[in-house]
Amino acid sequence: MKLYASGEDYLETILILHREMGMVRSVDVSRHMAVSKPSVCHAVAVLQEGGFLAMDGDHFLHLTERGRIIAEKIYERHRFFTDHLIEAGVDPKTAEADAYRIEHVISDETFHRLKEKYQSESENKGL
């Protein structure tokens, strides 16, 4: 099953909310993403069908191993681009919005090369 940017956003949001709150329900996702509850219900159903997400008997959402790996990958990219754009002087709100777009379109190879370059430069500055 192909996972689109919106699905990745839902997984990332569930990861973030789980870290902040411990337990996550659809209503929490709806509030955090400012989307309707029916939109969340549809996304949850699609993500469950794809094996990215599970819901327990109390309607709490849980990332599967597959979903967690994708969510962490997207979240890492998001933090990386947000932090570096802010460091470059971009307004934090703009940096956040741009990071959300960049995180979905950049290839794994390009992201890893950028990350290596920034880590290398950061280590060299410390010398």
PLM features: residue spans?
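N-terminal helix-turn-helix DNA-binding core of bacterial DNA-binding proteins
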Residues: K2-V35
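N-terminal positioning helix adjacent to the helix-turn-helix/winged-helix DNA-binding module
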Residues: S6-D9, R25, R66, R77, ...
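DNA-binding alpha-helical recognition surfaces that contact promoter or target DNA
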Residues: E12, H42, A97
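Canonical helix-turn-helix DNA-binding module
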Residues: S26-G57
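Basic, amphipathic "hinge/linker" alpha-helix immediately C-terminal to the N-terminal HTH DNA-binding motif
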Residues: H59-R77
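Arg/Lys-rich, alpha-helical DNA-contact motif
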Residues: Y75-E109
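C-terminal regulatory/oligomerization modules of transcriptional regulators
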Residues: A97-L127
